[in-house]
Curated annotation (Swiss-Prot):
The keyword Glycoprotein applies. It comes from Sus scrofa. This is Prostaglandin E2 receptor EP3 subtype. Residues 10-20 have a biased composition (Polar residues). It is found in: Cell membrane. The lineage of its organism: Eukaryota, Metazoa, Chordata, Craniata, Vertebrata. The keyword Membrane applies. GO terms for cellular component: plasma membrane. Interacts (via C-terminus) with MKLN1.
Length: 373
């Protein structure tokens, strides 16, 4: 049940296609090792910051959002810990995947893990976008209905639904197969074959298409909700333009939030769109990237597919920085810049007063003490 079925011709082609994957082992192993280390550090740091903020009383209104960030960081970190070590061991051992995994069960587990954790990240990002949009556009409904228990239920529901979808190949709908250059497994996009395998081919088409459409749908929901949030923030900022201090504060908040949301949309689109669109393209064109070493004319397509998968994996590293860590760093830099500017303005003002009215030194200390960020 766990082992993907292959014909004799397919097995021979696959063996030839993966034979040269050992040649790039010493070079390519740097990529998964770097991703594992950076991803683990970033997500662990994000989880630490979330746990500290979650315990504070003043963050009660942010608990739903903090739960989503913590769940996303945990999802990304566990996904990397389950997949990256397998790739590293395969590169360092200079073995083909079939030598390391003759039964094919590890391949199925690897593909299931990539599918489940990849879709989970996308859907959690969508849930966070919906949560932000509701908090900004419907604050009264949000405060009365959006409890932490509801957030936990939604996150758990996302996880269970994605896991059920990823288990479809185990039940016979779709396949997880070895992908070029033979160091990882993922959803099969193979659509050709003889009549005996037509049922498997239709299963491959359905499963791969469903994965792509689900991923693209999650991206669309995230984009729509983030744009709605930005629009609502800009409208509220204009409405508060009557009071200068309130207007300046809301302008700063709107700018920071808009930059962060646009950064999230850019990262998601760059990391996931190439893989999802290319999977649909290979299905509609009835092509496959599983036998790259056999058909040399597909070499460019195979290289692009590998880059697309690496970009999707890179999203697990960028998530904690885009959602939490980078925002904290930018806020600290902003505070330092404002504080420095206030000190310079205070020093200029003090120098002017001293030169004109010979102000007592005690007043300078008072002005400096009020110029803190």
């Amino acid at each position: 049940m766990w082992a993907p079925e292959r014909s004799a011709e397919e097995q021979g082609n696959l063996t030839r296609s993966l034979g040269s994957s050992e040649d790039c082992g010493s070079v390519s192993v740097v990529f998964p090792m770097t991703m594992l280390i950076t991803g683990f550090v970033g997500n662990a740091l994000a989880m630490l910051l979330v746990s500290q903020s979650y315990r504070r009383r003043e963050s009660k209104r942010k608990k739903s959002f903090l739960l989503c960030i913590g769940w996303l960081a945990l999802t990304d970190m566990v996904g990397q810990l389950l997949t990256s070590p397998v790739v590293i061991v395969l590169y360092l051992s200079h073995q083909r995947w079939e030598q390391l995994d003759p039964s094919g069960r590890l391949c199925t587990f690897f593909g299931l893990t990539m599918t489940a954790f990849g879709l989970s990240s996308l859907f959690i990002a969508s849930a966070m976008a919906v949560e932000r949009a509701l908090a900004i556009r419907a604050p009264h409904w949000y405060s009365s209905h959006m409890k932490t228990s509801a957030t936990r239920a939604v996150l758990l529901g996302v996880w269970l639904a994605v896991l059920a979808f990823a288990l479809l190949p185990v039940l016979g709908v779709g396949q997880y197969t070895i992908q070029w250059p033979g160091t990882w497994c993922f959803i099969s996009t193979r659509t050709g074959g003889n009549e005996t395998s037509s049922e498997n081919n239709w299963g491959n088409i359905f499963f791969a298409s469903a994965f792509s459409f689900l991923g693209l749908s999650a991206l669309v929901v995230t984009f729509a909700c983030n744009l709605a949030t930005i629009k609502a923030l800009v409208s509220r900022c204009r409405a508060k333009a009557t009071a200068s201090q309130s207007s300046a504060q809301w302008g700063r908040i709107t700018t920071e939030t808009a930059i962060q949301l646009m950064g999230i949309m850019c990262v998601l689109s760059v990391c996931w769109s190439p893989l999802l669109i290319m999977m649909l393209k290979t299905i509609f064109n009835q092509t496959s990237v599983e036998y790259c070493k056999v058909y040399t004319e597909k070499q460019n397509e195979c290289n692009f597919f590998l880059i697309a998968v690496r970009l999707a994996s890179l999203n697990q590293i960028l998530d904690p920085w885009v959602y939490l860590l980078l925002r904290k760093i930018l806020l600290q830099k902003f505070c330092q810049a404002v504080s420095q500017k206030q000190r310079e303005e205070a020093a200029t003002l003090i120098f002017t007063h001293l030169s004109i009215s010979r102000t007592e030194p005690g007043e300078a200390r008072v002005l400096f003490s009020k110029s803190k960020c």
